[in-house]
Design a protein with these regions (language model features):
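A structural signal for multi-pass alpha-helical bundles of membrane permease subunits
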Residues: 4-300
Length: 300
């Protein structure tokens, strides 16, 4: 290997090294430290004299009979993720199909308006929707009572209504991402394919089934995977709209359950163990989903 090649490789390493150092500092080190904490009894009472306890914290996650427990929170997290993803994908693809029509004028204006929910910070979105769900003065109840003659709903007083309110908020917040991804995929489909299908007498449904969906799938599958991870780990909306899992801690997701265990009850070892379980759940899901849907295959 010549001196010139060595210098070139050293220069490349010199350029890449800062990024690697930042990656190690903000990702690798915290991840390894979290694993270490999950194997310890670290808590507020043992913040300095903590020691390793093996897998005890992991066992506690699955065996503690607290209310809510891991299983009820996990089930609610699955329901939350599935319902949100269904609405995100269906609404996003539907709106993308509308915006992709040539007959629609002012597409740029509509696109900007529809993207706004995703552009607004989650803190503002959560607090705005929380105000809209207010029992006495919220705009949601005002519309229900004045426009439709329905009784006002106590959105944030019972577990079911609060959970529905949180889902509505996150659906409004999350559909623009899927819409933008789907719109980009639709615009990359050659128009000649639709023209050939029309010449063969294909209906709108057959074009959607045999051309549109197969060709946007390689783009949508990674987007759905990302959306699943983001929704599964969404702390801000649940925490702010439901006021930290209220009422009676019945609207917790796994991620808010971790936050409360670690930073409200100061059970750092328990929270770290639960966060590692969440990581493993999402890792297994992502690898399985990407493999089963063949996301890396070319569309055409």
């Amino acid at each position: 290997m010549t001196t010139q090649v060595l210098k070139r490789k050293a220069f490349i390493f010199f350029l890449v090294a800062p990024a690697f150092l930042v990656l190690i500092g903000v990702v690798v080190y915290p991840f390894i430290f979290n694993i270490i904490i999950s194997l310890s009894n670290m808590s507020l009472a043992h913040i300095r004299d903590w020691h390793f306890v093996g897998l005890k914290q992991y066992v506690n996650v699955f065996t503690e009979e607290s209310k809510p427990n891991f299983y009820s929170v996990f089930l609610k997290t699955i329901i939350w993720t599935v319902v949100n993803l269904i609405f995100h994908v269906v609404l996003g693809v539907f709106l993308a199909l509308l915006l992709n029509q040539k007959e629609i004028r002012g597409k740029a204006i509509f696109r900007t308006i529809l993207v706004l929910p995703w552009a607004v910070p989650q803190l503002i979105v959560a607090l705005t929707w929380r105000g809209m769900f207010n029992y006495e003065y919220g705009s949601i109840n005002l519309m229900l009572t004045h426009w439709f003659g329905l009784p006002a709903v106590q959105w944030l007083k019972s577990p079911f209504e609060t959970f529905v309110a949180v889902i509505i908020t996150n659906v409004w917040l999350g559909y623009p991402f899927m819409m933008i991804i789907a719109l980009g995929a639709l615009q990359s489909i050659p128009h000649e394919l639709y023209e050939a299908a029309e010449m063969d007498g294909a209906s709108w449904f057959h074009k959607l089934k045999n051309i549109t969906i197969p060709l946007i799938r390689p783009v949508m599958v990674p987007a759905i995977t990302l959306g699943t991870i983001w929704t599964f780990n969404n702390l801000n909306i649940v925490w702010l709209v439901s006021n930290a899992g209220e009422p009676s801690d019945q609207t917790h997701l796994l991620v808010s359950f971790v936050y409360k265990a670690a930073f409200n009850f100061y059970r750092y070892g328990y929270g770290a163990a639960l966060s590692m379980i969440i990581f493993l759940i999402l890792l297994v899901f992502s690898l399985t989903f990407m493999r089963k849907t063949r996301a890396t295959e070319a569309a055409y």
